[in-house]
UniProtKB/Swiss-Prot annotation:
Signal peptide: none annotated. It holds the Pfam family ADH_zinc_N. Substrate binds at residues 133-140, 269-273. InterPro entries: ADH-like_C (IPR013149), ADH-like_N (IPR013154), GroES-like_sf (IPR011032), NAD(P)-bd_dom_sf (IPR036291), PKS_ER (IPR020843), Trans-enoyl_RdTase-like (IPR047122). This is Dehydrogenase azaJ. The keyword Cytoplasm does not apply. It is an enzyme of class 1 (oxidoreductase). PANTHER family: HYPOTHETICAL OXIDOREDUCTASE (EUROFUNG), ZINC-TYPE ALCOHOL DEHYDROGENASE-LIKE PROTEIN C2E1P3.01. It comes from the Eukaryota.
C-alpha cells in the first residue's frame, strides 16, 4: 500500500503542516484518486482562519481543499463510471463532510463518483484542476430546483429565448456559468473588468459591461429591454462593498425586467430585497446529494471531450508539492483576477 501525505490544518488559524496521513479506502459509490494537481480557493483559507466560526461542524486536525485532477487508483462498490487508471477531475467535499479522507490537499483523496468527471488526455491535469468547485457552485445556482432551475445543458442545446445575467463573468464561477448557461440554451449578459471582456465573450457571453462604471445599472437595464429575463447569478469576491453592490444590482435588474424573479447569490442577501424577487445563497456541496451532480458531472466529461466546454480561467502553477499549498493560499489572499492558483504534485 502506498504512503499518503497530506497538508493538514492542525488547528484554527494555524499554518498547514505536511505529514503522513492514513491511506484512504474507496467506500460505496466512491473512488480513490492519486492527485496530480490541485487548486486553491477562498473557502480554503477562510476555513483555515475561521474554522467552526465559519462552518460549525469543522473539527481539527483537518485536510482542506476542493479542487483536484488525477488518476483513479481504486473504486468502491457500486461505481460504474470509472476504473483504475482513468484520468479524472473532481470536487473533493472533505470540508463539508468534516472528513479528511475527502479533502483535496493530499496525495490520495476519496471522491464521490457523482462529483467527478472523466478527463480527456488532451487536457493537462493542472488546467483541469481549476474547474470543480467553481463548476459545482455554478450548477447549484443555475440548475438546482431550489435556485434558478434552468434547463439542463446539452451538446446540442435548444434556444430558450431567455436571457440570464451573470455578474462576475471572469471569476472562476463566472467562467463556468457562462458556458453552462449558453449550453443550456440561454443568452448570457455579464459583467467584468474591461481587460477580461475578450475572455468572457470567448466563453459565450453576447454582451459584457464594466461593473465599475457608475452607469452599470442603467447599462444593464437598457441591455435587458425587450428581453425575457431568466434571473441572475451574482458572483463577487470577498470585499463586502463589492459583494453588496453585486447583489443589489442583480436584484434590482431582475425586479425591473420581464421574466423570472430569482437571483442566486455567492454572498449573503442584502437587507433590502425588492418585492416580488427571491434570492438564495449558494452552497456548492449541496449538489452532491441530488440529481444535478449526476446530470452535470456526466455532462462535463462529455463536453470536455467534445471541446465545447473549456477549463477556465487560466491555471497559474505557483509551486510543486504539498509544501507549496500554504504559499498558494497566502498568494490567493492578496487577490487574483481571471486565473486560478494551482499546485502540482510529483
Amino acid at each position: 500500500m502506498p504512503t499518503n501525505f497530506a497538508a493538514i490544518v492542525p488547528g484554527k488559524n494555524q499554518s498547514l503542516v505536511v505529514q503522513e496521513a492514513p491511506y484512504p479506502t474507496a467506500g460505496e459509490n466512491r473512488i480513490v484518486v492519486r492527485v496530480h494537481a490541485l487548486a486553491v480557493n477562498a473557502v480554503d483559507y477562510a476555513t483555515q482562519m475561521m474554522g467552526e466560526t465559519l462552518f460549525p461542524w469543522v473539527t481539527y486536525p483537518l485536510v482542506l481543499g476542493e479542487d483536484i485532477a488525477g488518476e483513479v487508483v481504486a473504486i468502491g462498490p457500486g461505481v460504474t463510471r470509472f476504473k483504475p487508471g482513468d484520468r479524472v477531475v473532481g470536487h473533493a467535499v472533505g470540508t463539508n463532510s468534516n472528513n479528511s479522507a475527502e479533502g483535496a490537499f493530499q496525495q490520495y483523496v476519496v471522491l464521490l463518483e457523482n462529483m467527478a468527471s472523466p478527463l480527456p488526455h488532451a487536457l493537462e491535469y493542472q488546467q483541469a484542476a481549476v474547474v470543480p468547485l467553481a463548476f459545482s457552485t455554478a450548477i447549484v445556482g443555475l440548475f438546482q430546483k431550489d435556485y434558478l432551475g434552468l434547463q439542463i445543458p446539452s451538446l446540442t442545446p435548444t434556444r430558450t429565448g431567455k436571457t440570464l445575467l451573470i455578474w462576475g463573468g471572469a471569476t472562476s464561477v463566472g467562467c463556468n456559468a457562462i458556458q453552462l448557461a449558453v449550453a443550456a440554451g440561454y443568452e448570457v449578459i455579464t459583467t467584468c473588468s474591461p481587460h477580461n471582456f475578450d475572455l468572457v465573450k470567448s466563453l459565450g457571453a453576447t454582451a459584457v459591461f464594466d461593473y465599475k462604471k457608475p452607469s452599470i445599472r442603467d447599462d444593464l437595464r437598457e441591455a435587458f429591454r425587450g428581453k425575457t429575463c431568466a434571473g441572475a447569478l451574482a458572483i463577487a469576491g470577498v470585499v463586502p462593498q463589492t459583494r453588496n453592490e453585486a447583489a443589489e444590482a442583480c436584484l434590482n435588474l431582475v425586479a425591473e425586467s420581464e421574466g423570472d424573479k430569482f437571483v442566486a447569490l455567492s454572498m449573503p442577501a442584502p437587507p433590502n430585497v425588492p418585492d416580488g424577487v427571491s434570492c438564495k445563497f449558494i452552497f456548492a456541496s449541496t449538489v452532491k446529494d441530488n440529481e444535478v451532480s449526476h446530470q452535470l458531472y456526466g455532462y462535463l466529461g462529455e463536453a470536455l471531450a467534445h471541446g465545447s466546454f473549456i477549463a477556465a480561467p487560466e491555471a497559474e502553477v505557483v509551486g510543486t508539492g504539498l509544501e507549496a499549498v500554504q504559499g498558494a493560499l497566502n498568494a490567493l489572499k492578496q487577490g487574483v483576477s481571471a486565473k486560478k492558483l494551482v499546485v502540482t504534485l510529483p
